[in-house]
């Protein structure tokens, strides 16, 4: 029960971090990583408690999506910092021009 509270608090901290820190792109990426890692840990513990060891492929799929999201986010941040010399989210819409 305590582990469930820890995982839910990690999830809500990541969600609140995304909602409250919308100024810098790097802080949004870090909060999104916290959100997705807590989701991964929750799914892994749920699969362990159900006694079905065949669901580990879904855990690897979620972890792969987290890694892809991180690489795409970091590449967007590098492009943003090279073109506009800042990592502010308000400059992100200017990348399309």
Curated annotation (Swiss-Prot):
GO cellular component terms, A-Z: mitochondrial membrane; respiratory chain complex I
Assigned keywords, A-Z: Electron transport, Membrane, Mitochondrion, NAD, Respiratory chain, Translocase, Transmembrane, Transmembrane helix, Transport, Ubiquinone
Primary location recorded for the protein, binned into one broad class: mitochondrion
Keyword Cytoplasm part of the UniProt annotation: no
Broad enzyme group: translocase
Pfam family, one: Oxidored_q2
Gene3D superfamilies tied to this protein: 1.10.287.3510
InterPro entries: NADH_UbQ_OxRdtase_chain4L/K, NUOK/Mnh_C1-like
Record EC number: 7.1.1.2
MF GO annotations: NADH dehydrogenase (ubiquinone) activity
Catalytic activity, reaction form: a ubiquinone + NADH + 5 H(+)(in) = a ubiquinol + NAD(+) + 4 H(+)(out)
Biological process, per Gene Ontology: ATP synthesis coupled electron transport
Membrane topology according to the record: Multi-pass membrane protein
Transmembrane segments: 1-21, 25-45, 60-80
Cell compartments where the protein resides: Mitochondrion membrane
Family: Belongs to the complex I subunit 4L family.
PANTHER family tied to this protein: NADH-UBIQUINONE OXIDOREDUCTASE CHAIN 4L, NADH-UBIQUINONE OXIDOREDUCTASE SUBUNIT ND4L
Primary role: Core subunit of the mitochondrial membrane respiratory chain NADH dehydrogenase (Complex I) that is believed to belong to the minimal assembly required for catalysis. Complex I functions in the transfer of electrons from NADH to the respiratory chain. The immediate electron acceptor for the enzyme is believed to be ubiquinone.
Name of the protein in question: NADH-ubiquinone oxidoreductase chain 4L
Originating species: Strongylocentrotus purpuratus
Organism classification: Eukaryota, Metazoa, Echinodermata, Eleutherozoa, Echinozoa
Gene name in the database record: ND4L
């Amino acid at each position: 029960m305590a582990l469930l509270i820890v995982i839910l608090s990690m999830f809500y901290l990541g969600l609140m971090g995304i909602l409250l820190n919308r100024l810098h792109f790097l802080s949004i990426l870090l909060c999104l990583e916290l959100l997705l890692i807590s989701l991964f840990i929750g799914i892994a513990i749920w699969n362990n408690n159900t006694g079905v060891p065949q669901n580990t492929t879904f855990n690897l799929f979620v972890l792969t999506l987290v890694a892809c999201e991180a690489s795409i986010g970091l590449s967007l941040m590098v492009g943003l910092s090279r073109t506009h010399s800042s990592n502010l989210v308000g400059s992100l819409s200017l990348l399309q021009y």
